[in-house]
Amino acid sequence: MSTHVPRRVALVTLGCSRNEVDSEELAGRLAAQGWELVADAADADAVLVNTCGFVDAAKKDSIDALLAADDLRAGDGEPAGAGPRAVVAVGCLAERYGNELAASLPEADAVLGFDAYPSIGEHLDAVLGGATVPAHTPRDRRTLLPITPVERGASANVAVHVPGHARGVAGGSAAGSPGRRRLTAGPVAALKISSGCDRRCAFCAIPSFRGSHVSRPADDVLAEAEWLAGEGARELVLVSENSTSYGKDLGDLRALEKLLPQLAAVPGIVRVRTVYLQPAELRPSLLEVLLTTPGLAPYLDLSFQHASPAVLRRMRRFGGSEHFLDLLDRGRGLLPGLGARSNVIVGFPGETEADVDILAEFLEAAELDAVGVFGYSDEEGTEAVSLPGKIAEEEIERRRVQITDLVEQLTATRAQERIGSRVQVLVEEITDGIAAGCAGHQQPDADGSCLVRLPGPAGAAAGPPAGGPSGTGQPGLPGQPGQPGVEVGDLIEARVVATEGVDLVAEFTAVLDRARPSAGRGEAAPSATGARATVLVGRPRADGT
């Protein structure tokens, strides 16, 4: 009889939803290589911290997470289970800084780049065995694949590893796993359709460590969508660095227009949401598909970054207030009431008070549902570092507060305008008769939420009442004979009756589509993501692309 004790690993994820997908790839690989995933870093033999390297605050959070993991480390002579014996950094911060990070942070036993992911278990074994694993040496990943987009596919995941694009990796929790293992059991799942970016925005360092744009083949994306549906996912959030570029390296500039209806038709999936859209590339045919295809979220996530044409030109971007408002008008002509979000940067070198006024006037006219406001800061390796016209940090902060205050007023007003309307809410949690989730115009974990008051005692229970069938897929009213109560994963309709900032408060009206039981669904693999009591100290939404 074997007495082998599986090695235990805790995964800690910081940063954006793309990093969450990468962590689930790492989880799948580790499970396939014999590792046991544990939720509490204190119970692990090794802690793997998937870092974020986007902005200074995210970098600090990543370093703090590594230091917190080191604080849990077992002392010399302590027995197994007394704490982790290895702390390893992966992710964007590790990829971007590599051996520099290793030299400045001896608390990390290893600093590994993306190309180490396929053999991640072997690297952890080596660290636990006392070996010194060479730190990653950073390279500009834009130089590692062919310049011509259509020539990249053959090299991706052969010459270099593209995180989140794994194919045929065993170890998922169901047969047919595409190489990832879910770390959360909720009804919303991120699905990576591409990685990298070919744009050269003056402020952005992401392409240098995420690389050139590489699309996943449509068959891979569809197979993973079907697997996620089998794992209990009901909404797919399509993530990338630039979703509008999807397919250009596959030889089909309209590949996304073809893929989206196929994803919306996957059995069990009730909503597909595309994020990280580049306004300059949002062609009319894609806009029409996004806003008229049944099953796609009524939603546009548009990376405006500013509204002054002069500032945008210095950013190496295109457009301005007039172009952006026209884009929103065309979208609302196709789908009145759509949700729209964006990010903006204030304090970019050369920005004037007049430019700030242009941005404010644009935001007042745009009627956006959510806006992320960032103050500019230099990112090493970017063109903007050397631009003239730098603005003092105090003035950048003043402008950030000014625009943030305006945005909070505008988005709260926008939410109030939805009072009396009916929204479709995907239930993510039920507590004391209140169902919490997101309406179609709200991106999960980004744009606020919707709290739905359920009718009577039937709604207070997460499970069906005695004698009521579950997972029928049929609409109905909770509490009626033969009808179950509302459950997590149900798509329900509700009438908005009040607001709290950007959050909506609504009254239940009907179940539109019930969560279906799945033979492939099981317990999600444990993860230290979100476990503030152990390691994770913060997760900013790092998506300024």
From Swiss-Prot:
<dbReference type="InterPro" id="IPR023404">
    <property type="entry name" value="rSAM_horseshoe"/>
</dbReference>
<feature type="compositionally biased region" description="Low complexity">
    <location>
        <begin position="455"/>
        <end position="464"/>
    </location>
</feature>
<feature type="binding site">
    <location>
        <position position="92"/>
    </location>
    <ligand>
        <name>[4Fe-4S] cluster 1</name>
    </ligand>
</feature>
<feature type="domain" description="TRAM">
    <location>
        <begin position="416"/>
        <end position="510"/>
    </location>
</feature>
<dbReference type="GO" id="GO:0035599">
    <property type="term" value="F:aspartic acid methylthiotransferase activity"/>
</dbReference>
<keyword id="KW-0808">Transferase</keyword>
<dbReference type="InterPro" id="IPR006638">
    <property type="entry name" value="Elp3/MiaA/NifB-like_rSAM"/>
</dbReference>
<feature type="binding site">
    <location>
        <position position="16"/>
    </location>
    <ligand>
        <name>[4Fe-4S] cluster 1</name>
    </ligand>
</feature>
<protein>
    <recommendedName>
        <fullName>Ribosomal protein uS12 methylthiotransferase RimO</fullName>
        <ecNumber>2.8.4.4</ecNumber>
    </recommendedName>
</protein>
<dbReference type="InterPro" id="IPR005840">
    <property type="entry name" value="Ribosomal_uS12_MeSTrfase_RimO"/>
</dbReference>
<feature type="binding site">
    <location>
        <position position="204"/>
    </location>
    <ligand>
        <name>[4Fe-4S] cluster 2</name>
    </ligand>
</feature>
<keyword id="KW-0411">Iron-sulfur</keyword>
<feature type="region of interest" description="Disordered">
    <location>
        <begin position="454"/>
        <end position="486"/>
    </location>
</feature>
<dbReference type="InterPro" id="IPR007197">
    <property type="entry name" value="rSAM"/>
</dbReference>
<feature type="region of interest" description="Disordered">
    <location>
        <begin position="516"/>
        <end position="545"/>
    </location>
</feature>
<dbReference type="GO" id="GO:0051539">
    <property type="term" value="F:4 iron, 4 sulfur cluster binding"/>
</dbReference>
<keyword id="KW-0408">Iron</keyword>
<dbReference type="InterPro" id="IPR013848">
    <property type="entry name" value="Methylthiotransferase_N"/>
</dbReference>
<keyword id="KW-0004">4Fe-4S</keyword>
<feature type="domain" description="MTTase N-terminal">
    <location>
        <begin position="7"/>
        <end position="129"/>
    </location>
</feature>
<comment type="similarity">
    <text>Belongs to the methylthiotransferase family. RimO subfamily.</text>
</comment>
<feature type="domain" description="Radical SAM core">
    <location>
        <begin position="183"/>
        <end position="414"/>
    </location>
</feature>
<comment type="function">
    <text>Catalyzes the methylthiolation of an aspartic acid residue of ribosomal protein uS12.</text>
</comment>
<dbReference type="GO" id="GO:0103039">
    <property type="term" value="F:protein methylthiotransferase activity"/>
</dbReference>
<dbReference type="Pfam" id="PF00919">
    <property type="entry name" value="UPF0004"/>
</dbReference>
<dbReference type="InterPro" id="IPR038135">
    <property type="entry name" value="Methylthiotransferase_N_sf"/>
</dbReference>
<keyword id="KW-0963">Cytoplasm</keyword>
<keyword id="KW-0479">Metal-binding</keyword>
<feature type="binding site">
    <location>
        <position position="197"/>
    </location>
    <ligand>
        <name>[4Fe-4S] cluster 2</name>
    </ligand>
</feature>
<dbReference type="GO" id="GO:0005829">
    <property type="term" value="C:cytosol"/>
</dbReference>
<dbReference type="Pfam" id="PF04055">
    <property type="entry name" value="Radical_SAM"/>
</dbReference>
<feature type="binding site">
    <location>
        <position position="201"/>
    </location>
    <ligand>
        <name>[4Fe-4S] cluster 2</name>
    </ligand>
</feature>
<dbReference type="InterPro" id="IPR020612">
    <property type="entry name" value="Methylthiotransferase_CS"/>
</dbReference>
<dbReference type="InterPro" id="IPR012340">
    <property type="entry name" value="NA-bd_OB-fold"/>
</dbReference>
<dbReference type="GO" id="GO:0046872">
    <property type="term" value="F:metal ion binding"/>
</dbReference>
<feature type="binding site">
    <location>
        <position position="52"/>
    </location>
    <ligand>
        <name>[4Fe-4S] cluster 1</name>
    </ligand>
</feature>
<keyword id="KW-0949">S-adenosyl-L-methionine</keyword>
